[in-house]
Regions:
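Active-site helix of classical SDR
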Residues: 3
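NAD(P)-dependent short-chain dehydrogenase/reductase
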Residues: 9-56, 62-63, 69-70
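Substrate-binding strand-loop-helix patch
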Residues: 29-30, 54-65, 85-103, 152
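Catalytic phosphate/metal-binding cores of nucleic-acid and nucleotide-processing enzymes, i.e., regions
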Residues: 63, 69, 77-81, 158
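Mid/C-terminal beta-alpha module of Rossmann-like enzyme folds, strongest
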Residues: 74-122
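A hydrophobic C-terminal alpha-helical subdomain
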Residues: 117-136
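Amphipathic terminal alpha-helices
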Residues: 146-161
Length: 161
């Protein structure tokens, strides 16, 4: 968080036109991410524990790319600033994992657990829901609900496997 903010401040100090999009819980059908990991784990395991006390909003990379494209294509990049983007709605990692498992057609028993059961050097916020009001007002965009976007991603993963 601190290094990201320092980077944003450096860009702002330069004095150029800029658009910064903050996001969270990013996933797609490419690379390593929570969705792909959970699909694999819930296919391979009978039981799994996932934290329920960290709340946020997943972000489908395709939706983020679409918003950025529309802003640039619509010649709106002069509206410089820092904007938040994630899909609509909120969930815990546990809720997200359960939905991934169900949409993938897996039957793993997913149990909720506390974050402190998974010690980490990186401190994770318990509530990381982004306020997208500024983005919506500036660019007049509608943002898809996280479950709808997850369905699209899972379907693309199924098609490519």
């Amino acid at each position: 968080g601190k290094t990201k903010r320092a980077g944003e401040q450096s860009i702002q100090r330069v004095g150029c036109n800029y658009l910064i999009f903050r996001t969270a819980w990013l996933y797609s059908q490419f690379g390593k991410n929570f969705v792909k990991t959970m699909r694999q784990l819930t296919a391979d395991k009978d039981k799994l524990r996932v934290v329920f006390d960290q709340i946020g909003t997943p972000t489908y990379a395709k939706d983020l790319a679409d918003i950025i494209y529309r802003v640039i294509e619509g010649d709106q990049y002069h509206k410089q600033g820092i904007y938040h983007f994630s899909n609509e709605g909120v969930c815990s990692w546990y809720d997200f994992a359960k939905e991934i498992c169900e949409l993938s057609g897996n039957s793993c028993d997913i149990q909720p657990c506390h974050s402190d059961e998974f010690p980490s050097k990186v401190k994770r916020p318990h509530f990381s829901v982004l306020d997208k009001t500024k983005l919506k007002l500036a660019f007049g965009v509608e943002i898809p609900y996280w479950k709808d976007s997850l369905v699209k991603c899972i379907n693309e993963l199924k098609e490519n496997n």
